[in-house]
Amino acid sequence: CVNCRPTCAITTGFSGAGAFSDGKLSLSYEVGGDLPTLIGEEFAQELIDYTDKIYLEFGADPHVEGIYTGEDIKEIRKNAIHAGLKLVDCPIRHLGTEKAQELYLAIQNYLADNGVEMRFNTECENIILEEEGCKGVLLKDGDSLLPVYADEVVIGTGRRGADWLEKLCAEHHIAHKPGTVDIGVRVECRNEVMEKVNKVLYESKLIGYPKPWKNKVRTFCQNPGGFVAQENYDNDLAVVNGHSFKEKKSENTNLAILVSHNFTEPFNQPIAYAQKVGELTNMLGAGHIMVQRYGDILDGKRTWAKELAQSNVKPTLKDAVAGDITAAMPYRAMTNIIEFIKMLDMVVPGFAANETLLYSPELKFYSNKVKMDSNLDTNIKGLHCLGDSSGWTRGLMMASVMGVLMGRKLAEKEGC
């Protein structure tokens, strides 16, 4: 990695990682985080339907994936139940990576044309607190700090800023609690293996609790004909992700398998824990994403580049380093992943093939959950938090919904 664009910029800027994701909009309140528990399931679904119309107005594809019924989906669900997995129904509106960038640029231009001032390449150092509450933010301006005052301050830093927000909460006693952090791998196999699931569901959302620990393990971000990608976070932390284009396709399907981790006491720094797992994996891969064949993991051996070259499954992340991801992945997480893959093989025969590829690390930094009420107010007057960094959402649609709700609440305060 030579820190080139867009690879190292895909988690920042307008719409954050959303513009460089493959743009999957989950159209069910059951997917995308815990916001429905805060505002109610029925209201959450109403907001999803409203927000979806906005996406359509800005050019989203009217076609919806995963709305098929009939014998095929019954068979998939039957196999999932037999395997001990729960299949979550969720229609998907797929933008595609290239279309997502166009759509979010259109939204950005619309906001700019309507008088919204945006500052890019600007670091927020801190918030301004007075006795009455939050009164603004401090921006870095060269060697000095520039105060920007406001009646209401909204923090929406995305997954990239989750660690920053956690430190801010600790410094200013913003009520929060350690949430869940997800540690896992990006799995890649041939399209032929996933053909039925891809056709019927497009994205299969499966949840299981494999023995012996029965931690929650789930599939996430499935990309038929997609590509595995690298994201770079602060401190040169390289993590793996996946995306798919609307037009350009590969011969493979990739998806994440994520193991949920919850910590209480004496340790309560889940983000730091996940970062250490990522740093250790990066060290073994000399700064690159590591990839290993599933069969080699079971055989207790590393994967070599020449073995990848001879495999049916060719890595779509070309600079991934063949090696041994088990040397860095915690035993509990690795065991959960292996057992979950065995369960998935009962739903998708061939998924647990020897040549199936596992890339590491895949980490989701939405751990810190800021305590808020249904009006999205924190314990500090005038301060609000949104999106994945708040700990309440996990994905494009639910984060967008939270933004819509926040906009309505602010408009109400202004008497609009």
Task: List each language-model region with its residue ranges.
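Conserved catalytic/binding loops enriched for acidic/polar residues
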Residues: 39, 43, 50-58
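Charged, glycine/proline-rich intrinsically disordered loops and linkers
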Residues: 47-49, 310
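Residues forming the flavin
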Residues: 1-39, 65-416
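Compact, glycine/acidic-enriched structural inserts
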Residues: 61-62
